[in-house]
A protein has these predicted regions:
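Cyclic nucleotide-binding regulatory module and flanking cytosolic helices
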Residues: 1-30, 34-35, 79, 84-85
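Short, small/polar residue-rich loop motifs at catalytic or cofactor-binding pockets
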Residues: 25-26, 44-46
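Glycine- and acidic-residue-biased ligand/ion/polar-headgroup-sensing regions
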Residues: 36, 47-60, 75-77
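Short phosphate-coordinating micro-motif centered on Lys-Gly-acidic
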Residues: 38-44
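Cyclic-nucleotide recognition modules
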Residues: 72-127, 134
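Polybasic "coupling" helices that flank or enter modular domains
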Residues: 98-99, 116-186
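Phosphate-/nucleic-acid-contacting segments
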Residues: 148, 159-227
Length: 227
């Protein structure tokens, strides 16, 4: 695998000249994980961060009674565990693979040294952190201010937006994982999907969802409409 070429195709490193990509490749370590492997646990020292090349990874917190709250699910090309790189602190959550996965690992000390020498790399990291902050702001808003139907509607619209605005979306995680991501339980999620279908807002066939009434979903997501 040509690490430098692979890094150049990742949004985080887009636009960097070849010499900077070579510098990144020189400190990068390829790590491969089987499905359901722990990459790091909450409280472990944040000694570096990762960029996913293949597979999917969930970031989650555990309550004292063991209940899981999924914070984010990352796919190929996305960085994770990057906040401790700048803070020099421990990982604030757990990371586990959902399928066989390959990631590039960047040790904190070496990466920070590269950033100090390369302002363009620092700007790219700042853009990533800004997007991540917006994502978690939406998550907090959804969990604290919206009812479950609104959270689900917002998630379906998010999937549509990230699939070029198509009306057909696919749930790429299990309903149990989606329920955790939305802060509910699988039984409640199934009931809401059924109600959305009966109202004519969506068609549901397993993991395949077709949006029939985008306006209704938008109003649900915004709290204007109730299910």
């Amino acid at each position: 695998m040509d690490i430098g070429q692979s890094l150049g195709e990742i949004a985080l490193f887009k636009g960097l000249p070849d010499d900077q990509l070579s510098d990144l490749a020189s400190i990068a370590l390829i790590k491969r994980y089987h499905r359901l492997s722990t990459i790091f646990s909450e409280g472990e020292p944040g000694s570096g961060f990762y960029v996913l090349l293949a597979g999917r990874v969930k970031i989650f917190k555990l309550s004292p009674d063991g209940k899981e709250q999924i914070l984010h699910i990352f796919g190929p090309g996305e960085p994770f565990g990057e906040v401790p790189v700048f803070e020099g602190r421990s990982f604030p959550a757990h990371a586990e693979t959902l399928e066989n996965s390959t990631a590039v690992y960047f040790p904190r000390t070496e990466f920070v040294s590269l950033i100090k020498r390369n302002p363009s790399l620092a700007l790219n990291m700042l853009a990533v952190l800004s997007r991540r902050l917006r994502t978690f702001t939406v998550l907090v808003d959804n969990l604290s201010l919206k009812e479950v139907p609104g959270r689900l509607a917002a998630h379906l619209l998010y999937l549509s937006q990230h699939n070029q605005g198509t009306e057909n979306v696919e749930l790429d995680i299990s309903k149990g994982q989606l329920a955790s991501l939305l802060g509910t339980i699988p039984e409640t999620l199934s009931r809401i999907l059924s109600r959305l279908s009966k109202q004519g807002y969506i068609e549901s066939d397993g993991r395949h969802i077709r949006i029939l009434d985008r306006t209704a979903l938008e109003e649900l997501a915004e709290g204007i409409r109730r299910l």
